[in-house]
UniProtKB/Swiss-Prot annotation:
Classification via InterPro entries: Ribosomal_uL16, Ribosomal_uL16_CS_euk_arc, Ribosomal_uL16_dom, Ribosomal_uL16_euk_arch, Ribosomal_uL16_sf
UniProt entry tagged with the keyword Ribosomal protein: yes
One Pfam family named in its UniProt record: Ribosomal_L16
Matching CDD domains: Ribosomal_L16_L10e
One MF term in the entry's GO annotations: structural constituent of ribosome
Annotated source species: Vitis riparia (Frost grape)
A single Gene Ontology CC term: ribonucleoprotein complex
Family assignment from sequence similarity: Belongs to the universal ribosomal protein uL16 family.
Binding partners and assembly: Component of the small ribosomal subunit. Mature ribosomes consist of a small (40S) and a large (60S) subunit. The 40S subunit contains about 33 different proteins and 1 molecule of RNA (18S). The 60S subunit contains about 49 different proteins and 3 molecules of RNA (25S, 5.8S and 5S).
Protein's UniProt name: Large ribosomal subunit protein uL16
Gene that this sequence comes from: RPL10
Length: 220
C-alpha cells in the first residue's frame, strides 16, 4: 500500500501534534539536512540573499521539503559552483500526520470497525506554514544572484499552493540592511559571528563615548 497523497493533509485543521511520549512510533522525516553548501563561509563572503516565501497557510510534507532542497542544491551546484552558495531550509517538519487504515479486500467488513476508534496511527511528518513565512533561503555573491533566483523558482514546483521569491534587502542572513552594514563596517562597529554579525552598541562608561555618537571608541 502506497503513501496517501499529501493533498489530503494540505489544510491546517487541527492543533499541532508533535512527537512525544504519548505519540510514539513516528517515522523519521525524509529531510535530514537543513544547511547545504558553504555553511561555514563568513558573513562578508556572501552579501546577496533571496527567500522563497509561502503565500498560503498550509501543511508542507517532509518529502516536499527534501525534494525542494535537492532541486535547489542541484541547480546551484551546476551553474554557480558547489563553493559559491549557502542554502538553508527554514522550516522543520514537527507536526505528525495520522492515517486510519481501511481494509479493502474481500471480507474486510468483518475485520474493521469503520469510523469507530478512528484516531489513526502516525504516517509521516509535515511543517505547519503560515502566510509570509520563509521556506528556503539562499545567500551567495552578487554575481550569482540570478542563479539563486532561478534555483528557488525550480524549488517552487515541489510545494503546493503559492509561493513568492523575494530578494532580501539584508546583508546575507543577518538582520542589518546592506547600506547600514557597509556603513557600520567602515566604522568598525560590526563584529563577524559566523554567518551572522554583531553590532557593537553604546554600552560602557560615558568617558569612552564621543559627543553626539552612540558609539564607543574603546570597542574599535
Amino acid at each position: 500500500m502506497g503513501r496517501r497523497p499529501a493533498r489530503c493533509y494540505r489544510q491546517i485543521k487541527n492543533k499541532p501534534y508533535p512527537k512525544s511520549r504519548y505519540c510514539r512510533g513516528v517515522p523519521d522525516p525524509k529531510i535530514r539536512i537543513y544547511d547545504v553548501g558553504m555553511k561555514k563561509k563568513g558573513v562578508d563572503e556572501f552579501p546577496f540573499c533571496v527567500h522563497l516565501v509561502s503565500w498560503e497557510k498550509e501543511n508542507v510534507s517532509s518529502e516536499a521539503l527534501e525534494a525542494a532542497r535537492i532541486a535547489c542544491n542541484k541547480y546551484m551546484t551546476k551553474y554557480a559552483g558547489k563553493d559559491a552558495f549557502h542554502l538553508r531550509v527554514r522550516v522543520h517538519p514537527f507536526h505528525v500526520l495520522r492515517i486510519n487504515k481501511m481494509l479493502s479486500c474481500a471480507g474486510a467488513d468483518r475485520l474493521q470497525t469503520g469510523m469507530r476508534g478512528a484516531f489513526g496511527k502516525p504516517q509521516g511528518t509535515c511543517a505547519r506554514v503560515s502566510i509570509g513565512q520563509v521556506l528556503l533561503s539562499v545567500r551567495c555573491k552578487d554575481g550569482n544572484s540570478h542563479h539563486a533566483q532561478e534555483a528557488l523558482r525550480r524549488a517552487k514546483f515541489k510545494f503546493p499552493a503559492r509561493q513568492k521569491i523575494i530578494v532580501s534587502r539584508k546583508w546575507g542572513f543577518t538582520k542589518f540592511n546592506r547600506t547600514d552594514y557597509i556603513k557600520w563596517k567602515s566604522q568598525n562597529r560590526i563584529l563577524p559571528d559566523g554567518v551572522n554579525a554583531k553590532l557593537l552598541g553604546c554600552h560602557g562608561p560615558l568617558a569612552n563615548r564621543q559627543p553626539g555618537k552612540a558609539f564607543i571608541n574603546a570597542c574599535t
